Regions:
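Structural/interface elements that position substrates and couple domains in central-metabolism enzymes
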Residues: 1-444
Length: 444
């Protein structure tokens, strides 16, 4: 089958590479000429484990192509929309890119084809997409059959290829037997028990519901962790005890310094707006967002607590991890950004800080763009040891393996101080305190 992917971000690039690997001929289209030129040179715009190799393999196998021309749509049996849907200032999903590619689909189809939304879009958006396509065909004075489908993605950054190749489920919202047949053909490598065929609006809402449920679990466990800090309980054991209930399970019950990324924050905002437009307050979802926004300031508050337990001034801070999660370079809505801004603002007057040393094994270049390089206090470190040397305090923001597996005895020798703020609860409190560290974690 000949397939086009509109957009070459996380979703588009992973989807295109994986579909090509399944035997389809895939053309990835993006209006960013520089990005397409780089992709044709083998330079990817994102970091995702295994993706560079998968792209190279399928480009060499003449199954995967990159272009900035929409003309290839004329040949395609199916066209996936994988463009961004960022949040507007008021919280609504910005759908301008979705409608723009829908128009291009309407301008270029020459035979019956299926327009498939991979992008996360609010309920009812696919109906609007259909109208945009119909309008383009009307202006062309052409009557060409087409179908619209909602096929939301459920890819986790850091394990996106595995998620695509071995999905928990494949959600497909469609209205015609033809669309059903095309989607079944695209995903013919998967067993029938992976599929849930439903109506379009239901498919759209499943995606928002899933992300909101996961975000709610994280905010819930973080609230419990904060209570543990107050009453002297252990959030690790609390989460374990809760997760042992088969009705609940253990996933997404790791307390920390807040969630971020390209999905949860914007999808929460969009779902709240969808509820408001339909006369619903969405109180639980609002509380999830508020709790997470507050949680991102906890590292600065923990630093304040820790500063009261040490006898030395805190001059140099090592911030370990900037990406919103490990195994990605994504800095969108990352807790590290909030923490570093808290340090620079220093409302509690913990400073003056002389150096804020920042380390991330993958996302450092993106961190420089997001956080900036103009403040002379900020020192970006390519090596973990360089960030730790002479630090009065270490603050762990992202649970990279490089950080989790660090030799704490070596850390003790390299540091000037002995205070560790653990925003992801990666260390064993007893062991770390036996080594002479003062340890501040989240509910633990």
């Amino acid at each position: 089958m000949i397939i086009a992917i509109l957009g070459t971000g996380y979703v588009g690039l992973v989807t295109g590479a994986c579909l090509a690997n399944m035997g389809h001929t895939v053309h990835c289209i993006d209006i960013n000429i520089k990005k397409i030129d780089n992709l044709n040179k083998g330079i990817l715009p994102i970091y995702e484990p295994g993706l560079e190799e998968l792209v190279r393999k399928n480009v060499q196998g003449e199954k995967l192509y990159f272009t900035n021309k929409y003309d290839i749509i004329e040949q395609c049996d199916a066209v996936f929309s994988a463009v961004g849907t960022p949040s507007k200032e008021d919280g609504h999903a910005d759908l301008q890119y979705v409608f723009a590619v829908a128009k291009e689909f309407g301008k270029h189809i020459r035979k019956r084809s299926v327009f498939i939304s991979k992008s996360t879009i609010p309920v009812g958006t696919t109906d609007r997409i259909k109208k945009y396509i119909e309008l383009e065909l009307s202006e062309r004075k052409e009557e060409i059959e087409f179908d619209v489908v909602s096929n939301p993605e459920f890819l986790k950054e850091g394990s996106a290829i595995e998620d695509f190749m071995n999905p928990d489920r494949i959600i497909i919202g469609c209205e015609s037997d033809y669309a059903h047949l095309v989607m079944s053909s695209i995903y013919k490598a998967y067993s029938d028990d992976k599929f849930l065929f439903t109506d379009i609006k239901t498919a759209e809402l499943i995606k928002y519901g899933a992300n909101s449920m996961l975000a709610t679990r994280l905010s819930f466990i973080n609230e419990l962790a904060n209570l543990c800090d107050k009453v002297g309980a252990n959030i690790k054991d609390v989460a374990n005890g809760i997760g042992l209930d088969s009705r609940i399970g253990s996933k997404f019950l790791n307390a920390g310094c807040g969630y971020g990324g390209s999905c949860f924050p914007k999808d929460i905002k969009a779902l709240i707006k969808t509820g408001e437009e339909n006369g619903l307050k969405m109180n639980i979802i609002k509380a999830t967002e508020e709790t997470n926004n507050n949680q991102k300031h906890i590292l600065y508050n923990k630093l304040y607590n820790g500063a009261g337990k040490v006898e030395f001034p805190i001059k140099t801070i090592a911030v370990l991890g900037t990406a919103f999660k490990p195994n990605t370079d994504d800095m969108r809505d990352a807790s590290s950004v909030v923490f570093i801004n808290d340090l620079l603002n220093d409302e509690l007057k913990l400073g003056p800080f002389e150096k804020i040393k920042i380390y991330d094994p993958i996302a450092l270049n993106y961190a420089k763009k997001v956080i900036g390089e103009t403040n002379e206090k900020l020192v970006y470190c390519n090596e973990l040891d360089n960030a730790i040397i002479d630090a009065d305090v270490i603050v762990i923001v992202t649970e990279w393996d490089q950080i989790k597996n660090i030799n704490l005895e070596v850390v003790k020798k390299l540091m000037k101080g002995n205070l560790i703020i653990d925003g992801r609860n990666i260390f064993d409190r007893n062991k770390i305190e036996e080594l002479g560290f003062i340890y501040e974690a989240i509910g633990y």
